[in-house]
A protein has these predicted regions:
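Alpha/beta-hydrolase fold catalytic core
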Residues: 1-33, 54-57, 97, 156-158, ...
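Active-site loop/oxyanion-hole signature of alpha/beta-hydrolase fold enzymes
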Residues: 15-16, 61-104, 108, 118-119, ...
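Conserved HGGG/HGGXW glycine-rich cap/lid loop of the alpha/beta-hydrolase fold
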Residues: 21-77
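Hydrolases whose catalytic domains are alpha/beta-hydrolase-1, hotdog thioesterase
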Residues: 112-116
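A conserved short beta-strand
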Residues: 122-141
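Alpha/beta-hydrolase
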Residues: 147-307
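Catalytic histidine-centered segment of alpha/beta-hydrolase-like enzymes
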Residues: 291-299, 330-339
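Short glycine-rich catalytic loops that host catalytic nucleophiles or stabilize transition states
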Residues: 324-330
């Protein structure tokens, strides 16, 4: 049975929005750092990174709405990632943590902490974006400026999740018989395929993903038909709609004041968030995996990394401090498959 590393505690916190399960580590009077996980993940994914932290930091890693052991309240997709950002703020209030905090966000969590900074720039000491979702959300944008491919953002949202994968999540499939079993999806995309995780830890992380709220209010969310390729457009409920470019746009971070320093860490082999993402409809259409693709001029792959870089360049031009670090041989979770390198970058940045 998998055990948490020494010094990490599991706690439940009642906030004025929902009950949140968290992992916490470090002295209560230490420098506060909040770690926000990504889609189809939980706080447990952070445990080894938390265990590597210097002793002066107080780390809080919540299970976000829709995932883990946090109360499974609905996700309002029309708010983008603001539900998650507001939940973090409510958690900090409940923990009586005041003042500016360091925010670390992985994938979807990166978008959530950018939204947090837009809404509360004075409350952020720094932002660390780890393989972050693009500031223009996930799917259905065509260029570095986030221009939508169609007016209804077809090809993003709750309707683009693979149905076999969704069913296996719903069935709590912890095996490895199918490429779409959650375990195999994690092995292929969450960390580098060459990385071999301890079996007990892998079992624990699979079990965490299987706690996800699989529904229209959680993952994947609802959807509506579209006259545009590939025939579905985002709905208004659930996490994939919150991530759709229709509802998620945190490019306004370039205008915040004050501007906290930003560290962007990414794996060079990320297949989830990239300019040729394995989950992007444009990229899949280009490969012939989805029929009737209308071509690059109509529906190109979303340039996710280029979009993030362009926004951070504008942030820097406006007076902000930014830094991009690429970890070679890493995938979507560099703090998993390259723990030492990622921890060194993060904790050096946090000081």
């Amino acid at each position: 049975m998998y055990r948490l590393p020494d010094g990490i505690q599991s706690v439940d916190v009642d906030t004025d929005r929902l009950r949140m399960h968290c992992l916490v580590a470090g002295p209560a009077d230490g420098t506060p750092v909040v770690l926000v996980h990504g889609n189809l993940a939980t706080s447990l994914f952070w445990d080894e990174l938390m265990a590597a932290a210097p002793p002066q930091l107080h780390l809080v890693a919540p299970d976000m709405r829709g995932f883990g052991d946090t109360e499974p309240k609905p996700i309002d997709g029309t708010r983008g990632l603001r539900d998650w950002a507001d939940d973090v703020h409510a958690l900090l209030r409940a923990l009586q943590i005041s003042g500016a905090v360091h925010l670390v966000g992985w994938s979807t969590g990166g978008g959530a902490i950018m939204q947090y900074a837009i809404d509360r720039p004075d409350a952020v000491a720094s932002l660390t974006l780890i393989d972050t979702v693009s500031p223009y959300g996930f799917g259905a944008t065509s260029d570095v400026d986030g221009t939508p491919t169609t007016a209804d953002y077809a090809g993003s949202g709750g309707g683009v999740a693979n149905p076999e994968f969704v069913q296996r999540l719903r069935d709590r499939d912890d095996g490895s018989e199918s490429d779409f079993s959650p375990r195999n999806v994690m092995r292929a995309f969450y960390w580098h395929p060459d990385y071999r995780m301890d079996a007990e830890r892998e079992d624990a992380l699979v079990a965490e993903v299987l706690k996800s709220n699989i529904s229209d209010d959680g993952y994947p969310g609802d959807h509506v038909p579209s006259q545009h390729w590939p025939g579905v457009a985002p709905g208004e409920r659930g996490i994939l709609n919150a991530l759709s470019g229709r509802w998620c746009n945190v490019s306004g971070i370039v205008d915040i004041s004050p501007k906290p320093p930003v560290l962007w860490i990414r794996g060079d082999g990320d297949l989830v968030v990239g300019d040729q993402s394995s989950f992007d409809m444009g990229a899949l259409g280009q490969l012939g995996a989805i029929p009737d693709w209308p071509g690059d001029e109509v529906y190109p792959p979303q340039p996710m990394v280029a979009q993030t870089r362009a926004v951070l360049e504008r942030y820097a031009a406006g007076g902000g401090e930014t830094r991009e670090e690429v970890i070679a041989g890493s995938s979507h979770g560099p703090f998993i498959d390259h723990l030492d390198a990622c921890a060194a970058l993060l904790y050096d940045f946090l000081g």
